[in-house]
Design a protein with these regions (language model features):
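Positively charged n-region of N-terminal signal peptides that target proteins for export
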Residues: 1-4
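N-terminal signal peptide c-region/cleavage motif recognized by signal peptidases
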Residues: 13-14
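Short proline/glycine- and acidic-rich turn/helix-capping motifs at secondary-structure junctions
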Residues: 90-101
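Long, contiguous binding/interaction regions
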Residues: 18-57, 86, 105-123
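Amphipathic, hydrophobic secondary-structure cores in small proteins
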Residues: 76-77, 86-92
Length: 123
């Protein structure tokens, strides 16, 4: 009974948060991290991009599965999750040396944001 009461109290008192706006918060990154993210990592990933899949709620980007690209994707995701917290970000590596996939999805409106903000990725 005490556990049930605790669960009910927890559910009632847990604050709900509003969704963040569809805007890149560049201030979430330090000046050095911002330069690295936008001026180095993003262009490097665009150059390595093999394919793009359009999804109903976002996009998937295919990359070669080499270690250097995996490291770039990982570092890019670390920055992107801070400046664009409204993204659902998934990294998937196919078995047997298959492709590396970066998936950006989210709530309604995210796909349109990606189309506008990632125009240089040639969606």
């Amino acid at each position: 009974m005490k556990l049930l009461l605790l669960l009910i109290i927890t559910a009632i008192t847990v604050p709900s948060f509003a969704d963040s706006p569809f805007a890149c918060n560049r201030a979430a990154l330090t000046p050095q991290a911002r330069k690295r993210h936008f001026d180095e990592l993003s262009p490097a990933l665009r150059a390595r991009k093999k394919n793009i899949r359009e999804l109903c709620n976002g996009f998937e980007f295919e990359f070669p599965p080499d270690t250097a690209t995996f490291d770039l994707v990982s570092e890019w995701v670390e920055g992107e999750r801070l400046c664009c917290p409204f993204f659902d970000i998934d990294v998937h590596v196919e078995r047997e040396g298959g492709s590396l996939w970066l998936r950006l999805t989210g709530r309604e409106g995210v796909k349109q944001f990606i189309k506008a903000d990632f125009a240089s990725w040639k969606l």
